[in-house]
A protein has these predicted regions:
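Alpha/beta-hydrolase active-site loop
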Residues: 128-147
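Short glycine-enriched nucleophile-adjacent loop
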Residues: 162-174, 179, 186
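A catalytic-pocket lid/entrance helix-loop region that shapes and gates access to the active site
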Residues: 176-236
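Catalytic-loop region of hydrolases
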Residues: 20-107, 411, 418, 422-431
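Bacterial Sec-dependent N-terminal signal peptides
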Residues: 1-27, 199-210
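Conserved alpha/beta-hydrolase
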Residues: 102-121
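Alpha/beta-hydrolase fold active-site neighborhood
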Residues: 233-348
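Alpha/beta-hydrolase fold nucleophile elbow
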Residues: 149-159
């Protein structure tokens, strides 16, 4: 009886504490400048969840240039917990909780990237889509929410979001105590040559030969395959005016090796025997979908392509060996994989890449880099350095979609946990 009473009292106390935290948090949010918030369904294992709209200047150095509202999501665990900023690289139409947030049992602010989704100015002036402005958005959010969360702060992101976390740390090294970069590349040029070396050496020669043979099959049998691609595109309601259908198809064939390794597809699944055009297209679209080169997706990733063409750097396609098989793509120079909005012209400036590639190995402390050995983007991973207090994990056999803490060995996970506990001065219990 006493035990039941004690349990009842504890449950009641926790319930009342949760209600009190929600009420206090509502009050504190009302007091924040330039933040509009709406309560949404509470995320599991959190006390409260909100969708936010945060007023941001288009130009952080000149408020007269106008403003926009940046979409974000707040998941509240407790005022005494660390806070994780999850930096997205693209749009974020719905909430998600990062692995890192769950791992340390923290609060989370999930932030949609400027010029994506609903985080758009009334008119898109791409002159203000720079990493300095992007990280200025993050700094402003950090400054505002530090009025509520006064414990340790972390930032994390996946892929382009991971790279954004690193650029944020470069521009504002004191905003967070720890950064965790998942599979985020830091390129070194407009066309990073390391991608080609990776694709020429990853896996086994037999597998790479199968990939190449399949590409050649697709191109040699274009007459039979293109009608199937057209039928597939009509069914999927895809439009091709930025690229015509044949050009989009050739791009998708060139993209195939990159996509194959990026997401760790199985060499045994590459169709080679008794191959029919229908079988080829069915498999091909499951790995390198032509929709990626359709008008809708080219437009949807327009801001990403602009960033890649001006500051981030990116990759291209080595086409010389396919001379005679490509009609739409050049085989005299490598076609680049950036497709700028409205086919606008933009100049690449290598200055920032040079700066961050110098800064990371010398001053990139308290950063954890997590990559998968199969992932094509591991080719442009931040190189390990003994000159900084940082950690690198290249998880064997993992790719862009599953190189995560949960995929680590017990030894790797213990190493990561020890570093986080040391840097954050907390105890992490994930038994």
């Amino acid at each position: 009886m006493k035990k039941l009473l004690l349990i009842t009292i504890i449950v009641h106390f926790i319930f009342q504490l949760t209600i009190a935290q929600k009420t206090k948090l509502d009050t504190l949010l009302f007091e924040l400048p330039d933040v509009v918030f709406t309560k949404i369904k509470t995320t599991e294992n959190f006390a409260a969840t909100y969708e936010l709209r945060i007023k941001q200047p288009v130009d952080h150095s000149d408020a007269t240039k106008g403003h926009f509202y940046q979409r974000a999501y707040l998941s509240h665990k407790g005022f005494d917990r660390p806070t994780v900023m999850m930096t997205e690289g693209y749009d974020r139409p719905q909430i998600r909780i990062s692995e890192l947030t769950e791992f340390i049992k923290g609060n989370q602010i999930l932030i949609e990237h400027r010029y994506f989704g609903e985080s758009m100015p009334d008119s898109l002036d791409y002159n203000y889509l720079t990493l300095k402005q992007v990280t200025g958005d993050l700094h402003r959010i950090n400054t505002i929410f530090r009025q509520i969360y006064k414990n340790k702060w972390l930032s994390t992101g996946i892929s382009k979001g991971g790279a954004t976390t690193l650029f944020y740390r470069y521009f504002y090294p004191d905003d967070v105590d720890v950064s965790v970069n998942y599979v985020g590349p830091i390129n070194n040029a407009f066309e990073d040559q390391r991608i080609y070396k990776f694709l020429d050496t990853v896996g086994t020669k037999a597998c790479r030969d199968k990939i190449n043979s399949f590409q050649r099959y697709l191109l040699k049998n274009k007459k039979e395959i293109l009608p199937l691609i057209k039928a597939y595109s009509l069914g999927a309601k895809l439009k091709f005016t930025y690229h015509n259908l044949e050009k989009a198809f050739e791009f998708a064939v060139m993209e195939y090796p990159f996509s194959f390794w990026q997401y760790g597809y199985n060499c045994a699944d590459i169709p080679v025997k008794a191959l029919s055009p229908f079988e080829a297209v069915t498999y091909f679209t499951s790995v390198s979908d032509i929709s990626f080169f359709s008008d809708e997706q080219v437009a949807g990733y327009g801001s990403h392509y602009y960033q890649s063409a001006t500051e981030f750097g990116y990759y291209g396609y080595e086409t010389a060996e396919f001379k005679g098989l490509l009609n739409e793509l050049s085989t005299e120079q490598n076609p680049h994989a950036t497709f700028l909005p409205n086919k606008m012209k933009a100049a690449f400036d290598p200055k920032l890449l040079n700066e961050i590639n110098t800064w990371l190995p010398k001053q990139g402390n308290k950063i954890i880099h997590i990559y998968g050995t199969l992932d094509t983007w591991s080719a442009t991973a931040v190189p390990p350095s003994n000159s900084v207090d940082a950690l690198w994990f290249f998880i064997e056999g993992k790719h862009h979609g599953n190189a995560r803490i949960k995929a680590m060995s017990l030894k790797e996970k213990a190493k990561l946990t020890t570093a986080l506990e040391r840097w954050l001065a907390i105890k992490i219990d994930n038994d």
